[in-house]
Amino acid sequence: MDTGVTSPRVLVVDDDSDVLASLERGLRLSGFEVATAVDGAEALRSATENRPDAIVLDINMPVLDGVSVVTALRAMDNDVPVCVLSARSSVDDRVAGLEAGADDYLVKPFVLAELVARVKALLRRRGSTATSSSETITVGPLEVDIPGRRARVNGVDVDLTKREFDLLAVLAEHKTAVLSRAQLLELVWGYDFAADTNVVDVFIGYLRRKLEAGGGPRLLHTVRGVGFVLRMQ
């Protein structure tokens, strides 16, 4: 019986036919509509023409690799959530994927249930907003314009990605309160489970560098063993 509910559309990209078939089958059984691509160029065409709700993308592919695909999508202002898959587990590799604009990074091998949970988290995050505030929040020389999605330090605009601003907005709305990694994963990335990822630390690092680039004071502080807080020292 047709319930009128449309299943989320996921584009899965991998040049390994066995992996691709396995992911397609698993995601379909989990309730997703699935399209596939076997290389980066095909993935970029499909993402542009068919507008999937999320992309699961292997990082090592012929023609156009995963990082290049994400970079191209973001350059076209396509903010589709992307989960990058890779056998590379080093921090540098994860950072490269995230800096390109990926929303999540999952190391192979992984359990299908975790991939499904992460895709659902990305979709939840996309369907909501990082914050409901309608004000400009000030912390020392930092101004966070929530409705305008702009940040300024000493009156100078700070160039932030969508995810960086989402994280900063959440921290600003809870200024002086220490938020744990788990809380930030849920509020910013939409995770409702204990994800094994250092994505919060990576993005905190991005924000610190950008906020302090002009010689501004340290505003983002780490509370060892607890989490992170936005405040003047």
Curated annotation (Swiss-Prot):
Compartments, as annotated in UniProt: Cytoplasm
Pfam families found in the cross-reference section: Response_reg, Trans_reg_C
Positions of the DNA-binding region: 134-232
Induction record: By nitrogen-limiting conditions.
Record key words, sorted: Cytoplasm, DNA-binding, Magnesium, Metal-binding, Phosphoprotein, Transcription, Transcription regulation, Two-component regulatory system
Binding, Mg(2+): D15, D58, N60
Statement: the UniProt record of this protein carries the keyword Phosphoprotein: yes
Annotated CDD domains: REC_OmpR_PrrA-like (cd17627), trans_reg_C (cd00383)
Example GO molecular function: magnesium ion binding
Residues with the Phosphothreonine modification: T6
Limits of the Response regulatory domain: 9-123
Any one Gene Ontology BP term: regulation of DNA-templated transcription
Entry comment on modification after translation: Phosphorylated by PrrB at Asp-58. Also phosphorylated on Thr-6 by PknG/PknK/PknJ. The two phosphorylations act synergistically to activate the DNA-binding activity of PrrA.
Cited function: Member of the two-component regulatory system PrrB/PrrA that is involved specifically in early intracellular multiplication of Mycobacterium and is essential for its viability. Upon phosphorylation by PrrB, functions as a transcription regulator by direct binding to promoter regions of target genes to positively regulate their expression. Autoregulates its own expression.
Name this protein carries in UniProt: Transcriptional regulatory protein PrrA
